[in-house]
Amino acid sequence: SSDPILAGEFLLPAGSSSAAILDTFQHGEVIRRFVTIPEGLPSILVHERLMAEDHLTGEIPVPVEGSVLPDTYDFERGEARSAVLARMQAAMQNYLAEAWPKRAEDIAVDSVQEAVILASIVEKETGVARERRMVAGLYSNRVKDGMLLQADPTIIYPLTKGKPLGRRIRQSEIAAINDYNTYTMVGLPKGPITNPGREAIAAVLDPAETSARYMVADGTGGHAFAETLEEHNRNVAKWFEIRRQRGEM
């Protein structure tokens, strides 16, 4: 056959004839490789993950926080990292363009960017899928009420750019004044604190209807929610007791 030879990486069965090899090079399927970006992976770690893929080529900057849609992406050997990153960012833009017009009425955010910022907090605050809309509802209430969001991940982000802190948060860090710490500033941080997934964004665009304003860990990986500070303080006392029993305090 005089068909052109395709560029790419191919799988050749052992013992293939020269004719079969030529046919594979002309008409075969190029091997696709995969890279997965999990929900809540900050951009500094997205960058690390792409740079660690030996089959990709070229340099990329650390992407803007919140610009990458967590998912599994395929690529060919020798493809530019910049091309793969561009697909990840286009996927986020496409998802937001589709999701934003379907948002519920009277939500707490006024723009797509604000939705991504709040979704990044929801993403970092709960790993329990069934809680996402509840956590989004709670933070939406706090935004609307002009309350401090008091989200611990916003303390950590300026310190580590989203990498694990690896220790307890210090009192001085809780009191720090910067563009992200929601213990010392009313409203949303100046930007996202991670790359939120579809579910966290969807939760912010259609949060649970709840009167909850407070939450604390419940010892099972989830949270205990409360409408009043008094109720919340009881939940905090229970959490401290669980931690004492575990030898964490």
Summary of predicted features, one role per range:
Residues S1-A7, P38-I44, G66:
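Acidic helix-start/capping segments at beta-turn-to-alpha-helix junctions
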